[in-house]
């Protein structure tokens, strides 16, 4: 009995110790400044720091439609409500850098005068300077994932931070680390795909890129991050944005929480909350998750912010509150620190009433305000609320453009290359067709100059569309543009004009090869919902008719999610998935098609083949039921068009000599895994080396395989390099039925390409803490 009691006591002590080790180390100087400021504030001023309004409320448009700051209106709002934060571009459209500099200087001057506390501005800089004209647009996050290159992620975030701080904005609502595990969901392209490890690594790299190494001292070239959308947002049961998700408790902890935990451990200063519900509980009302998992278990002292007006959803849609005041009570007590209430200050009055009525404790208001003030001190906003654009000479320059091109090039995935149709030789006549052949909007996607990205062609005119890039490389006289199908730019993202397929077919008679650029127009969030995952019938008919000409067809997929193309895939000799590569996407594609560059991207998600087979790569063996005999003769095979991690190259690679440092292991061990990779082709290339594991027998149904490590290597023809990974034995653990992390005794298999090794765990270990 004494031994049992001792074990229980030690488990409790271990849990307490773990919970009290904060993911961000406290800075005594900053904490003293925060407390000194906090004690000077009235209740109204504290609540004001918890509020975030949209920029539009602080100004108006002149007769030419150009936004300006109305200093009288700004003074009135800040004097009365003591607002602590402002978001979004005016008119939801990118101003120039000079305009941003002026807007924020005007507001900060009034804020410091009226409150003595600077506002903190936030923007959705989701793939570069998305809300500043003249800034750099990088590939979308799904492309970053396809590179399997952490340095691309980090350097892109560093450049984004530089250009964002250049216009005096110190905060971005990025990176998005939801797991895109439902192909129907309209925001897959905003995050890093379906795998929690890949998402964790890329998200962590971006946090370091945005913020730097020290979250307590963020310099003038870095900005605060907001990891989003916490959590379970990416797997709505309907596939539609902001609708409920149903996730097993084990998957919620093991997979969906993982990227957020990695970001917190990297020092992320803020987190944005999932707009919808998970397992019947709206996330904005879930105290167990928001306060328990996110704050108390990790010791995290950052800011938890709502998404757009989401507290209102608690009474208008989720029906867990009777009115707005009740919704505020629920959300703030659940752990919300900042309220994104874009167009209304009503919450200020309600919060004051709730505190005076004892329905929200003053300690909760102090905690929320303290967190906001802490972020502002960490950003050094009290001393430097604004920056000077002239001090940022690299803004919108060649250095960042080259980085955007590099990222786009490494992200594109070669899916098919029959008969070595690619690279396309010079001197050939090429037909460029399809709705994505001559639009910057399609290359940039949503969150590009505007929310839906619908004005990208207006702002990105100096960059090359796919057609323009082909003309530059192959000569305009050798490239014919006849799109056959076009988008209705005045309609919904999915609307197309009356097809002119015969015109494209006629044009194909005079060419050697057809390049069909198909996919989706730009969209984001709820406007991007769909009812059918198949690529549009018009576009598929275009490909079918062109294939009848007998000319070879290369498909270029330019889409935010994997639209089904099973009926036209066999008709193409070459297929390239460029995802959403940004302003340099046209040039990157042509560099690859011409052979000047080599493909190295790999699929960051599973590309489905059938509408009823949307499984992820880590599906469990029990999800795939083979044919049975007799009365129960049926087949439940999981089909895929292309698997996670799939991608071809102009060269070939041979893997050999897989070694592990130990065949037996236990909790706490580090297993060294090495493999030789040789470039056996005739051109140089980069190869992403992926290490997977399989738990062969477990007390809960195990995943078929899981990604555990990856790295990218560059090899010259004939060159061999040894890749070495240090695999933590604890990474082979899983979350069990009781919600506890558990590493079980038993057999495992490690796999890299066609190489494998068997290893054995000698002892079972269960963690006493919520997180490993």
Residue ranges and their predicted role:
Residues 15-736, 742-756, 772:
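Glycoside hydrolase catalytic-domain context in secreted enzymes
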Residues 1-23:
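Bacterial Sec-dependent N-terminal signal peptides
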Residues 757-772:
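Short beta-strand elements
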């Amino acid at each position: 009995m004494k031994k049992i009691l001792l074990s229980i006591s030690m488990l409790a002590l271990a849990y307490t110790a773990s919970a009290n080790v904060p993911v961000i180390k406290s800075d005594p100087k900053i904490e003293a400044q925060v407390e000194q400021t906090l004690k000077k504030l009235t209740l109204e001023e504290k609540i004001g720091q918890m509020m975030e309004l949209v920029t539009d409320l602080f100004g108006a448009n002149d007769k030419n439609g150009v936004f300006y700051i109305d200093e009288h209106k700004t003074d009135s709002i800040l004097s009365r409500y003591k607002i602590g934060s402002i978001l979004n571009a005016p008119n939801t459209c990118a101003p120039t850098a000079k305009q941003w500099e002026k807007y924020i200087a005007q507001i900060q001057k009034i804020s410091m005068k009226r409150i003595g506390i600077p506002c903190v501005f936030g923007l959705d800089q989701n793939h570069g300077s998305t809300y500043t004209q003249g800034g750099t647009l990088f590939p979308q996050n799904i492309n970053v994932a396809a590179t399997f290159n952490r340095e691309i992620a980090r350097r892109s975030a560093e450049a984004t931070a530089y250009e964002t701080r250049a216009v005096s904005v110190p905060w971005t609502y990025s990176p998005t680390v939801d797991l895109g595990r439902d192909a129907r969901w309209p925001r897959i392209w905003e995050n890093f795909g379906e795998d929690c490890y890949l998402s964790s690594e890329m998200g962590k790299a971006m946090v370091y890129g945005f913020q730097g190494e020290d979250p307590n001292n963020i310099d003038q070239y870095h900005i605060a991050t907001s990891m989003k959308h916490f959590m379970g947002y990416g797997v709505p049961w309907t596939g539609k944005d902001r609708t409920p998700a149903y996730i097993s408790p084990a998957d919620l902890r093991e997979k969906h929480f993982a990227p957020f935990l990695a970001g917190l451990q990297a020092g992320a200063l803020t987190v944005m909350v999932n707009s919808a519900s998970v397992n019947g509980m709206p996330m904005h009302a879930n105290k167990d998750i928001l306060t328990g998992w996110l704050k108390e278990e990790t010791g995290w002292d950052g800011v938890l912010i709502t998404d757009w007006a989401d507290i209102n959803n608690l009474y208008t849609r989720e029906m867990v509150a009777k009115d707005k005041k009740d919704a505020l009570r629920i959300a703030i007590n659940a752990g919300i620190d900042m309220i994104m209430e874009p167009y209304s200050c009503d919450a200020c009055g309600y919060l004051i009433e709730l505190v005076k009525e004892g329905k929200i404790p003053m300690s909760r208001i102090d905690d929320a305000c303290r967190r906001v003030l802490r972020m502002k001190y960490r950003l050094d906003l009290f001393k430097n609320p604004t920056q000077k654009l002239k001090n940022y000479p690299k803004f919108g320059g060649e250095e960042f453009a080259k980085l955007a091109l590099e990222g786009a090039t490494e992200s594109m995935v070669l899916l098919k290359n029959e008969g070595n149709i690619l690279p396309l030789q010079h001197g050939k006549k090429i037909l460029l067709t399809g709705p994505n052949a001559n639009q910057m909007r399609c290359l940039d996607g949503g969150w590009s100059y505007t929310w839906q990205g619908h004005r990208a062609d207006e702002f990105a005119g100096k960059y090359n569309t796919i057609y323009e890039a082909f003309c530059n490389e192959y000569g305009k006289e050798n490239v014919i543009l006849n799109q056959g199908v076009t988008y209705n730019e005045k309609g919904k993202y999915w609307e197309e004009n009356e097809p002119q397929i015969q015109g494209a077919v006629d044009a194909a008679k005079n060419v050697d090869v057809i390049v069909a650029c198909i996919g989706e127009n730009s969209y984001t969030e709820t406007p991007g919902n769909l009812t059918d995952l198949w690529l549009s019938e018009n576009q598929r008919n275009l490909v079918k008719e062109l294939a009848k000409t007998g000319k070879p067809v290369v498909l270029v997929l330019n889409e935010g999610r994997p639209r089904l193309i099973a009926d036209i895939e066999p008709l193409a000799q070459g297929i390239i998935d460029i995802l959403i590569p940004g302003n340099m996407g046209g040039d990157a594609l042509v560099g690859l098609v011409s052979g000047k560059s080599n493909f190295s991207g790999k699929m960051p998600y599973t590309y489905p083949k059938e509408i009823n087979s949307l499984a992820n790569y880590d599906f469990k063996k029990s999800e795939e039921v083979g044919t049975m005999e007799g009365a129960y003769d049926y087949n439940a095979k999981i089909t895929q068009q292309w698997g996670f991690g799939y991608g071809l190259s102009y060269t070939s690679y041979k893997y050999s000599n897989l070694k592990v440092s130990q065949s037996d292991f236990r909790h706490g061990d580090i297993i060294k895994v090495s493999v030789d990779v040789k470039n056996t082709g005739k051109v140089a290339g980069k190869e992403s080396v992926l290490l997977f594991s399989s738990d062969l027998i477990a007390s809960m149904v195990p995943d078929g395989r899981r990604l555990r490590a990856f790295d990218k290597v560059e090899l010259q023809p004939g060159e061999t390099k040894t890749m070495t990974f240090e695999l933590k034995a604890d990474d082979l653990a899983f979350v069990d039925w009781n919600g506890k992390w558990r590493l079980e005794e038993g057999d495992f298999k490690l796999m890299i390409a066609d190489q494998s090794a068997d290893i054995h765990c000698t002892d079972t270990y269960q963690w006493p803490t919520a997180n490993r």
